Amino acid sequence: MIYRWLLLVSCLLLALLAQRGAAKSSSPKIAPPTKIDHKPSSLFYFEDTDTVLMNTVNGDLLRSVDAGETWSVVEGDDGGMKHHVLLIRQHPYDNKKAYALGPNGRHWVTTDQAKTWASFNIAEFPAIRHYPLVFHGGDSSKVIFQGEECAGRYCIVRSYYTTDDFATVKLLRESTGGCAWAVGHPQFAEDLNLAEEIKDRSFCVVPGLKVPLPHANRLVYSDDYFRGNAEGTETKLQEGRPVSGVISTAAVKKFIVAAAKSKGTEELALYVTVDAKNWHRAEFDGHRIEEDAYTMLESTNYSLQVDVLTSPRSGMGVLFTSNSNGTYFTRNIEHTNRNSEGMVDFEKIAGIQGIVLVNTVQNPEEVESGSAKKKITSRISFDDGRTFQPLKSDGENLHLHSVTALRNIGRVFSSPAPGLVMGIGNTGNHLQEYAECNLYISDDAGVTWRRAIKHPHKYEFGDQGAVVIAVRDEGRVDKINYSLDHGKEWASVELQHKIYPTMVTTTPDSTSLKFIVVGSLKESQDGEHVIYSIDFDGLHERKCEEDDFEKWPARLDEHGKPDCLMGHKQFYMRRRANANCFVDEEFKDPQPIFEACKCTAEDFECEYRRTEDGKGCVIPSPLTPPEGECKKPDDKFMGPSGWRLIPGDACIRDGGENLDKEIERSCKDASSPSTDGKIRVTLQLLEARDYAQYYYLERQSSSSGSDETIIMLSSEHEVYVTHDHGKTWERPLKGEEITRVYLHPYSSDVAFLLTDGKEGFWTEDRGHTFKPFQAPAPPTQDRFLQVMAFHPVHKDRLIWTGAVDCHSGDCHSDAFIKKGRGKNWEPLLSYVQKCEFESRETRPNSTNLVYCEQFEKQSKNGRLQLLSSDDFFNDNEVQFVDVINYATMSEFIIVASRQPENPDSLVASTSVDGRTFARAQFPPNVQVPVQTAYTVLESSTHAVFLHVTASSTEGGEYGPIIKSNSNGTSYVLSISAVNRNSLGYVDFEKAQGLEGVAVVNVVSNVADVSKKVPKKLKTMITHNDGAQWMLLPPPTKDADGKSFGCSVVAGKGTDDCSLHLHGYTERKDERDTFASGSAIGLMMAVGNVGDHLAGGDEADTFITNDGGISWKSVKKGKYMWEYGDSGSVIVIVPESKPTKTIHYSLDEGDTWEEFQFSDVEVRINDISTVPSDTSKNFLLWARLSNSEVQDKFATFNIDFSGVRPRPCLLDENQGNSDDYYIWEPKHPFQENNCLFGHSEQYHRKKPSAQCWNDWRESHVHSIGTNCTCTRADYECDYNYEPQSDGSCALVPGLPKPDAMEICKKDPDTIEYWEPTGYRRIPQTTCQGGLNLDHFVSKPCPNKEEEYKQKHGISGVGLFFAIVTPLAVAGAAGYYAYSKWDGKFGQIRLGESAGTSQSFLSRDSWLVTVPIAIVAGTVAVARALPLLVTSLWRGASGFIRLGRGRGYSRPYASRGSFAARRGDYTSIVDDEDELLGVEDAELDEDDEA
């Protein structure tokens, strides 16, 4: 018995020993490889699982549930996923969800880690330029799907949303920049108790209310998926006001960042919020942020990291770190290395606060000059970027390849394995090529490094750093290297196949002992690939115990002791490098240990920003001292220091620094000397004799600076520059003779100063510095030709027109092109007159489109031909062979060429796409047999205004203005006999900022002008874009309160009594316009009241504040004027006579004050301010004579900034406020404020509000409503002309236009409409109402069947056509029956006296039956024809699905400006009759 027990025990011991021996193996286990036929495009693990998804380039989706050992193809329930997965996305905040997007509108979602997939349908291709999926940070069931439709640079994004994992999908809205959730990250607003308020909030970048171009984009939000308010609420990004030009938004941990860019600058404004409500503009310590020139980097929980491009040519930047609310950024390190895709060599060490690895450029000056390649060096910071130091290996500097040379998936250097960091690099002076580098490793978070293995490798960490693997990353390999002691000792294991490795990866938390290695069997990495699964589970026989771990400090200070960051030290319990065990805690992340520190200065930040010396904080606004303090300026009071403890900082206050305590401040700090109510004057006497021209470098709304820069060219050709609006002047190019100045029209910080030779100068920093440049030839000698042309998109792409062969007698102009900064000038075309870039955002595939006028046969005696090219004239196309000139305006190119059949006459042609031209069809009532000149006036409202010279007799020039349709080809007469001068300029001006308002001067005595009688001019105004014109109503009193010597009728101007204004042809400076784009509704002018425009000596000065409907006399005599602060201040000064005073108004011209700016009288040549009229500074250009100087050129700066104490407060949601009211432009003949089918609303400062607008851009508050159509929404069609009653009639003797022309142009068109004489104004958005352009539709030839199918009544329609009249008849009969009460005319005051029924009571059959029959018969007889007609007309065109022509979207979304011609249902006349509005309809017809 004892023997048996001994034998049993012995066997058990042997079995146990044998089992332990099997547990420890000498090498990792490699599963049989899996071969796939196509290259993987992406791969990811579901976090905390062994489940892996892999997408291949052929559209297959593979799944592994055992960390890559085995794989299966995911086919879906019906096999639809096979070969149809375009891309896969993992939910970043839910480890159970993933999404597979298909190319054909069918997509799939899994909520159980790819065990099952549910399909959903969205008929959109996933967005490429925007995120196709946007995830909610708080509710993983909420996802936004985005598809896009692009034409050139412009895209329409359609965003769909789900709140139930795509079980249901709804359209969120259309936009231009996509949509995003407010809660875009789990950390967003998590401590602010806003969960309920913002849980459903979404932001969308949508088109501007008026202009569908990027510079007008808006950021709107909705808390109900845009159901209650389809337009959404505009986000107040800057000081409680909306901002235009929003490009995109991004969620970065606890921040949301929005980027905006204005027209005319590349500078971006970044706005940041931490609560989705309050936004602030981020400041970058004086640095500019430009589009595609900043990168949002991996950020912390308490700050943003941004790298800003500073050198576009060479790819270098500056690294910035923000304060805790993301508003003020501090520069960390200069010359960071970037690539052309915006990737930055920057990475935070995973799991450890405050350690950052960056690469910088050692030789920035040489690289910038183009004389050397980058020398890249690596730097590391252990204090969150405050200081950086070199990486060290064996006493030498170490440099590592980083993000710009990414060779594997995942992070570059680190993983969640505490303290372990690896990289490919070399020691020495700078970084070498990748192939020359080795693998280095650090196990103390980058403090010290050692070489691990020679040659570059792909690498990965496992088991919290207990295992490190590396696969050589050059050529074919057949082995894997691994280390179990933090890279000190290495071993290897053979692979079955030789591969070119493409991926080495493991679980995201690096806690697994399993790895995946993917490689290609071909060097090209196309075709067949192999997947290996490597398992290290058997290499150690035991799991680590407590003694195998060490308490490892994550950060050390310069003395080698644990360092504090954000108020605490950080430690990890980490496996010792030599421990003979595995951690084997799969999917359990290492947990940091924190120990609090006492507060130091590093735990505080400035609430706004630091002082220049970095030792204190700037207080953003004047301090308010406590009540009773500051009785004297030299007194002191206790006020804020400007410091605050960084939010989230856990330092111990007791015994530590206390920078945020109040400090003693001088009462001088509490005063604001600039707002003392006074106007300030600064006189500057200049050495120049006079000015020849001056140029403002307008600062755009997204620009960060505040300078007001002017470049002035003196009469001696010397340049003067001021950055403070003339308070001080400097001469940066003293001694240089500058003959021309060109401002870059698409980049307002850039200007070019030319000489008469090849030498020139340019500035890109608003005149602070000027750099010389060499032109390929001297400027063209033709003073009427422009020397420089600029590309609208590529700001460094230029065309230069220069004089060539001028010493040989064959002086002509050649064009040269510079294709980018740093590029050389290249010849473009010889013997040219003008060359221009024709790239436009609304013109697809036009990036390289160039137009040039070239003399035929390269001879100045040849005809001038117009050429176009897409490849800089390697090839070209002749557009016209005999042109006079061409002009580009808005979306149109208009060409004037000679008629082949009559060379003495011109013909106009128009193109929208820049490829095809159509000959302009002039209206027959414009009889100009020999067309000698055109003037293109304006085309901002989707139509061209063209002046055709009818008389070119000297002193008697005039002609009609005609207006085009939306493609610029068919014209109608807008107004006749408009004044022109000998240079071709026309008395026509659009009121800036107001749709459809324009002013002209017409020649009223045309018959006499041909007899050499001087022209008599009358001023007329239109409020509906030239469809109707009226005389200007005069003021009731003149400036002295006296009546004018004439009278008006019903407040309207008459031929004998109206206001007439001196116009464009009489201006010294074309910039002196009536109106301002920022002072909406205000216009000023000089003129007189009477029967025609009198001479300048009889002129007075007038103002209107309602867009020209009513006018007021301001001053007797002629004055020059300028608007400031968007119209809240207006300054006028006498023209052409000595003065020492100006007059100004602070209430839109209601009252005027006088201000003396000089002790002696001076003669003012001009008054100016910034072109946007948003400054509080004005500049008087004068000639001064006093006891000290005689007739000296001088400037006076008049500064109003101290007059008012504060900026105005605006609440966009309320509209009206204490400082603002909502103003709507009106039409003098309409009561509903509708212009172009909608009413607009603007914020205007109340004249009584004592505050400043401080807004650089005029802002539409809203498009109030789309109105019903009226006569004002129509203009006369081709071959029709307006009559005296406002109607349109066919021109006598002319046929109606061929309505069937549309059928010939488009074979797919089913129907055409008989002409009515009217057409819709191109920009109107009206809906319903008066339908003047469509009455009768007819089928196109051979389209009768399709026409019947489209308009025929269905069985259901026929049923209702029969039943409805009968039902109406029955209802009418019952009504008569129920209301009859026995006697006609009976009035009952109480109950009937008796209860017996009379023969004629209402219940008597003698009454009920006849009445029912009669009423029914009458109702049927009346209703049936009307209803049948209504149904027929309704089916035959008043409800239309399309008109058989291409639908061009003139606006960016369906919601705003949706209406187009013929897209809306109208109520027909007979339906109006049924509704009882016959009389109203007749009245409206009479008016029409």
UniProtKB/Swiss-Prot annotation:
Glycan attachment positions: N301, N325, N481, N845, N967, N1266
Family: Belongs to the VPS10-related sortilin family.
Membrane topology, record value: Multi-pass membrane protein
Pfam families linked to this entry: Sortilin-Vps10, Sortilin_C
Protein name: Vacuolar protein sorting/targeting protein 10
Record's keyword terms, sorted: Glycoprotein, Golgi apparatus, Membrane, Protein transport, Receptor, Repeat, Signal, Transmembrane, Transmembrane helix, Transport
Subcellular location: Golgi apparatus, trans-Golgi network membrane; Prevacuolar compartment membrane
Predominant location category: Golgi
Segments on the Lumenal face: 24-1351, 1427-1488
Bilayer-crossing regions: 1352-1372, 1406-1426
Role: Functions as a sorting receptor in the Golgi compartment required for the intracellular sorting and delivery of soluble vacuolar proteins, like carboxypeptidase Y (CPY) and proteinase A. Executes multiple rounds of sorting by cycling between the late Golgi and a prevacuolar endosome-like compartment.
BNR repeats: 63-72, 380-389, 440-450, 482-490, 720-730, 1102-1112, 1144-1153
Signal peptide: 1-23
Matching SUPFAM superfamilies: Oligoxyloglucan reducing end-specific cellobiohydrolase, Sialidases
Cytoplasmic-side segments: 1373-1405
Annotated GO CC locations: cytosol; Golgi apparatus; membrane
Glycoprotein among keywords: yes
Gene Ontology process terms (BP): Golgi to endosome transport; Golgi to vacuole transport; protein targeting to vacuole
